[in-house]
């Protein structure tokens, strides 16, 4: 989630597995560079219940290779997904995994970026099984927030029960 000046929020952030994960001693959280107050109203609008934290004012996102400053971008290439990437934006997708041991120490154990993240997008998983596949002109060009599809009522959510 970038600062709302750009008014952009990734449409893929909709997690329904949190309860299952919690019973496996796993916590799923999202981290955004924007100040917390800038994305809490959006979180409520989407009906999202996962923990969402702000890294505003810290280097957290840069430390894990998903945020880049203007000087890095002006150089023509940034290190993203463990390789030089000439067409990166200021914010790029990524997921990192951490382990907290019984002593309370936290260890970074895994990160995935770009195409390594599509396994987390169940819509893509289902589309990949179909004859037309993803049927995209550009990556995720078809994806909308759940309340921005013409046929969806404003109260609809990707995890709500459909009425028949």
Predicted regions and their residues:
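Short His-Asn-centered micro-motif
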Residues: 28-34, 39, 55-56
């Amino acid at each position: 989630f970038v600062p709302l000046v750009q008014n952009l929020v990734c449409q893929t952030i909709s997690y329904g597995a949190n309860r299952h994960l919690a019973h496996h001693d796993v916590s799923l959280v999202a981290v955004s560079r924007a100040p917390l107050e800038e994305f809490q109203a959006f979180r409520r609008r989407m009906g999202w219940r996962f923990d969402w934290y702000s890294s505003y004012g810290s280097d957290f996102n840069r430390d894990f290779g998903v945020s880049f400053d203007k000087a890095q971008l002006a150089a023509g290439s940034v290190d993203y997904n463990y390789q030089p990437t000439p067409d990166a934006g200021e914010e790029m997708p990524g997921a990192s995994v951490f382990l907290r041991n019984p002593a309370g120490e936290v260890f970074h154990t895994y990160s995935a970026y770009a195409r390594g993240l599509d396994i987390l997008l169940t819509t893509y998983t289902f589309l990949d099984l179909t004859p037309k596949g993803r049927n995209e002109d550009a990556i995720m060009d078809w994806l909308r927030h759940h309340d921005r599809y013409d046929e969806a009522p404003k109260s609809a959510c990707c995890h709500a029960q459909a009425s028949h």
